[in-house]
């Protein structure tokens, strides 16, 4: 796993995934965690969670992302489960930093939302 793999995934999410930009901090955190956990399950051959409507929603977004990752990035088929988990943890951290921590959108934490 290299920094370039993390950069590849981050650029992909920034370009293609709207779930990272929900209107509240807790929504963004929930989506980042939920979708990327499902992506991890799909990329490592585990059965995705689909027991609740929320899990099915995350699964739908994750399925498209996992398929795109396999198609766009040849390295995705060469990394093991631990590397995928490490990579997705790094991606989660970067997304939280960019879309929540350093966001200038004051509505994210507005008390009336």
Curated annotation (Swiss-Prot):
Q: Which region is the signal sequence?
A: none
Determine if Cell inner membrane is one of this entry's keywords.
Answer: no
State any single GO MF term: metal ion binding
Q: What class of enzyme is it?
A: oxidoreductase
Q: Which reaction does it catalyse?
A: N2 + 8 reduced [2Fe-2S]-[ferredoxin] + 16 ATP + 16 H2O = H2 + 8 oxidized [2Fe-2S]-[ferredoxin] + 2 NH4(+) + 16 ADP + 16 phosphate + 6 H(+)
Per UniProt, which keywords does this protein have? ATP-binding, Iron, Iron-sulfur, Metal-binding, Nitrogen fixation, Nucleotide-binding, Oxidoreductase, Vanadium
Q: Which cofactor does it need?
A: iron-sulfur cluster; vanadium cation
Can you supply a Gene Ontology BP term from the record?
A: nitrogen fixation
Which Pfam families does the entry link to? AnfG_VnfG
According to the UniProt entry, what is the EC number of this protein? Answer: 1.18.6.1
Q: Which sequence ranges form a coiled-coil region, renumbered to this chain?
A: none
NCBIfam families with a match to the protein in the record: vnfG_nitrog
**Self-association and partners:** Hexamer of two alpha, two beta, and two delta chains.
Question: What does the record give as the function of this protein?
Answer: The key enzymatic reactions in nitrogen fixation are catalyzed by the nitrogenase complex, which has 2 components: the iron protein (component 2) and a component 1 which is either a molybdenum-iron protein, a vanadium-iron, or an iron-iron protein.
Name listed for the protein in its UniProt record = Nitrogenase vanadium-iron protein delta chain
- Give the organism the record lists: Azotobacter vinelandii
């Amino acid at each position: 796993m290299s920094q370039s793999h993390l950069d590849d995934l981050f650029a992909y999410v920034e370009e293609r995934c709207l779930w990272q930009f929900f209107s509240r901090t807790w929504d963004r955190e929930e989506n980042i965690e939920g979708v990327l956990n499902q992506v991890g399950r799909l990329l490592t051959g585990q059965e995705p969670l689909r027991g609740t409507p929320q899990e099915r929603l995350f699964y739908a977004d994750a399925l498209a992302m996992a398929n795109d990752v396999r198609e766009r990035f040849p390295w995705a088929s060469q990394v093991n489960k631990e590397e995928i988990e490490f990579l997705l943890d790094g991606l989660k951290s970067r997304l939280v930093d960019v879309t929540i921590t350093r966001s200038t959108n004051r509505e994210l934490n507005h008390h009336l939302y």
